[in-house]
Amino acid sequence: MTPSPFFKKLKTHTAAAVCAATIGLFSSTSAMAADMSNGANNFYQSQQVTIQKVTFKNQYNMDIVGNLVIPKNLNKKTKASAIVIGHPMGAVKEQSSMLYAQKLAEQGFVTLAIDQSFWGESTGQPRNVVAPDIYAEAFSAAVDYLGTQSFIDPNNIGVLGICGSGSFVISAAKIDPRLKAIATVSMYDMGAANRNGLRHSQTLEQRKQIIAEAAAQRYVEFKGGETKYTSGTTHELTANTHPIQREFYDFYRTPRGEYTPKGSSRELTTHPTLTSNVKFLNFYPFNDIETISPRPMLFITGDQAHSKEFSEEAYKLAGQPKELYYVKGAGHVDLYDRVDLI
């Protein structure tokens, strides 16, 4: 994708503002051959970068694990610009984040693709827990790490959030001015999506039923009962499978993007715990979004994306400078990895 003039100009001022201007896709090793139809390239492997596994603490003394991606031609005698990259909600860094991380590193940025707390290789028990404040903290912890590296310019660190991480990076940026520019791709406001559904399709009564189910399940689990999981991506398609679930299935349940991190199982991937998922109902990332200004914000969405309402709402509320960029012909999941569109 060709960068807009707005972000060509920003490139001279800050590293992360341009992070989504060249929407790229990432890769990693997988036991399955990657499905490359429609330009999908989730498991891309760059020959122009080095990848180093790093671990650092967040404020809660939890381990955050990430892949530090460094251009092979980087001059470590100078201070490089850096970008922190967050994966889609329920995913791990090996899904979409590492493609972006490598493509941006090929442009000269040092990038850091992290696993969220409770997911992937990062610590946190129980697994698959929803904790929006801790999710936001992961991005500030990543700045702690990057900003103390001798070859990184601590005043030129930005952040890119994909899908649900788009809302988490906004939450982080509101209280961490070290994030100098903020970009989102196919953003989901995980608070609004869980409270109201897409396009306000969920009623208050339905929301109350979800809350009641989670409350009842807490008793079950407190007494030693089995942990229950919710939402996420279906494991099989039927004639009645919703088109949006089919879109996610094509990425998460096929060789195109399927990845099971060590210590998890295919059955649990993408699924948060039911009792913790209601934490999203108290998550309002767009409140006070205008206070991020004058740091620049970029919202990228497909013009066919079922989720575009969230990027549009964030853009409407954000202060200047800001840009809303539509990728023609792209759906929500297309921007995870379909390089012919992004």
What are these regions (language model features)?
Residues D35-T78:
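N-terminal cap/lid segment of alpha/beta-hydrolase-fold proteins
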Residues G90-Q102, Q116:
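The serine-hydrolase catalytic nucleophile loop
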Residues K103-T123:
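Conserved alpha/beta-hydrolase
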Residues V129-S150:
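Alpha/beta-hydrolase active-site loop
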Residues F151-C163:
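Alpha/beta-hydrolase fold nucleophile elbow
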Residues I170-T254:
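Alpha/beta-hydrolase-fold enzymes
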Residues I292-S293, F299-T301:
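Short beta-strand/loop motif that positions the catalytic acidic residue
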Residues A330-L341:
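Catalytic histidine-centered segment of alpha/beta-hydrolase-like enzymes
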